[in-house]
Structures are given as structure tokens and as C-alpha cells.
């Protein structure tokens, strides 16, 4: 005698079928699919912070963040120009992701645990820190010379509640002069009112690229922070794709593009990734 399938078995079957259908729907709803269907990538970024994102003489956005956007577009469409940049304030970097105004934010976003509760961070593409800018003819050669100078050393810094504390992490006895703008800070170095300026290492390197032979920087930096792009949480396919693109830009087939951008904006020749055993597994 044949028995009818039990109600329990039927419910299990329906649940499994529903779960499978939901899985297919979720995969189809990935940002990766919608970006590919649209035919262009929409990147949130800034426009006033060289060498990361700023307007060139032709009015077009340029900088390292902009180049990162082009690299992701190339990964998507094999065409780095298929990208639209939405200029946004720093405060809008996360809200614009959450409201789907942009597909990704690449705007020198510092990775923090609290921000990671709101967005998903990609692989980091730069490690920032505080560096020192000195005139090329400075009597101070390295950080030890500057430490030995004690309070006879004057360091210019952009005005900030933590400015003095930050400088004293590296130069405990230095005199710290604070300025209202970056231009005034650099003028203090140029005029000799300050022996050095302490600012983002990326800014130090960029200024040296823009003014060959005028400045130099000791081989020392401190207060590290990580920069990454950010995407909306909950879309692993999209995050995986962006991470794959960035990974191959920094270690694989697209390394020449990443290295050329790094050289252009920071004046640094990156060593080629080691061939053989993947370095990320060491």
C-alpha cells in the first residue's frame, strides 16, 4: 500500500525550494549585476584633496582615488573610462552608499571598526601615516638628528586639537607651531620660521613630486592608518569582485597600472610583486 508524503516532508520540500529561489534572487540582486547591466560604474569621491582627488587644469578629476576608480571600471568593462564620479563631501561618503547614490566610495576613507559596522571595506590600497617635510638644504638629515635637536627644533603643523600630541609622538621635545591652513604651514618651512612641517605622508611625497629638488623627507613616518574603498554591507559578490580587482592591481596582472599611478602621485617606484609563492600566504 502506497503512503502519501507526510505534511512534514512537503513542508521541508517547500522550504528548501523557497530557500533556493531566495538564493538565486539574492545573487541576481547583487550590485555587480546591476552595474554591469547599467554599463558604467558610479564612484563617490572628493574634488579638493591632492594627490587623492582634485580638479586638474582641464577641469577633470584626477588623483590616486580617481585612478582606483578607473581600475575597477576596467575590471568591470575592460574599459577604464566607463565610470562616473559623483563629487561628495567627506560626511556623505557613507550615507551616499546606504542610499544607493553611488556604487562605491573611494575617497581616502580611513578604516575604523566603528565605520565597519556601517559599510563593508575593501582591501586596503594605501597605508597613510604622518611624515616630515624639510627644505632640501636642511641641516637635519634623519629623524635622530631632529630628536637630538630637542626644543630648538620647530615643527609647523595644521591647527588641530591633537596636533601637538601627534608631533610629540615622534619628536617629544620639539616646539610646535600651528597654522590655520596648509599653505601657511608650508610657507613657514619655506621662510625658515619652521624647520619642518608634519603632515600626511602622502602630501609630503606629492609636494616633493611637484617641486623636484626643493624638499626632502626623512625615511620615517608614524601614526599609521589604512585607506580603503567602501561598499554597502550585505553584498558579498560585489565586495568579492572589487577585492579581486584591487588585489590583482596591487599584486598581479594589473600591477603596472597601479605602480604607474603610485609613481605619478607619490614619486615612489614600487618593487614588482615576487614571482612564485603568493606573498599573501607567507
What are these regions (language model features)?
Residues 83-95, 141, 159, 177-187, ...:
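Short helix-initiation/N-cap motifs at beta->coil->alpha
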Amino acid at each position: 500500500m502506497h503512503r502519501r508524503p507526510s505534511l512534514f516532508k512537503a513542508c521541508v520540500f517547500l522550504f528548501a525550494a523557497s530557500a533556493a529561489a531566495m538564493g538565486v534572487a539574492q545573487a541576481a540582486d547583487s550590485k555587480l549585476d546591476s552595474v554591469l547591466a547599467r554599463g558604467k560604474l558610479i564612484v563617490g569621491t572628493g574634488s579638493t584633496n591632492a594627490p587623492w582627488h582634485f580638479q586638474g587644469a582641464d577641469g577633470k578629476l584626477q588623483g590616486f582615488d580617481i585612478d582606483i576608480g578607473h581600475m575597477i571600471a576596467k575590471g568591470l568593462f575592460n574599459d577604464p573610462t566607463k565610470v562616473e564620479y559623483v563629487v561628495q563631501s567627506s560626511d556623505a561618503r557613507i550615507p551616499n552608499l546606504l542610499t544607493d547614490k553611488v556604487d562605491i566610495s573611494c575617497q581616502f576613507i580611513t578604516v575604523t571598526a566603528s565605520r565597519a559596522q556601517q559599510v563593508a571595506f575593501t582591501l586596503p590600497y594605501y597605508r597613510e601615516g604622518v611624515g616630515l617635510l624639510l627644505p632640501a638644504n636642511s641641516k637635519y638629515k634623519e629623524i635622530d638628528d631632529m630628536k637630538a635637536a630637542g626644543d630648538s627644533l620647530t615643527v609647523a603643523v595644521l591647527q588641530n586639537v591633537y596636533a601637538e600630541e601627534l608631533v610629540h609622538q615622534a619628536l617629544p621635545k620639539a616646539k610646535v607651531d600651528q597654522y590655520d591652513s596648509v599653505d601657511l604651514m608650508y610657507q613657514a618651512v619655506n621662510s625658515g620660521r619652521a624647520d619642518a612641517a608634519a603632515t600626511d605622508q602622502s602630501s609630503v611625497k606629492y609636494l616633493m613630486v611637484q617641486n623636484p629638488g626643493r624638499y626632502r623627507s626623512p625615511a620615517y613616518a608614524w601614526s599609521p592608518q589604512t585607506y580603503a574603498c567602501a561598499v554597502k554591507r550585505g553584498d558579498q559578490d560585489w565586495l568579492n569582485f572589487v577585492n579581486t580587482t584591487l588585489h590583482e592591481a596591487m599584486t598581479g596582472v594589473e600591477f603596472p597600472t597601479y605602480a604607474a599611478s603610485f609613481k605619478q602621485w607619490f614619486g615612489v617606484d614600487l618593487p614588482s610583486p615576487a614571482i612564485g609563492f603568493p606573498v599573501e600566504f607567507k
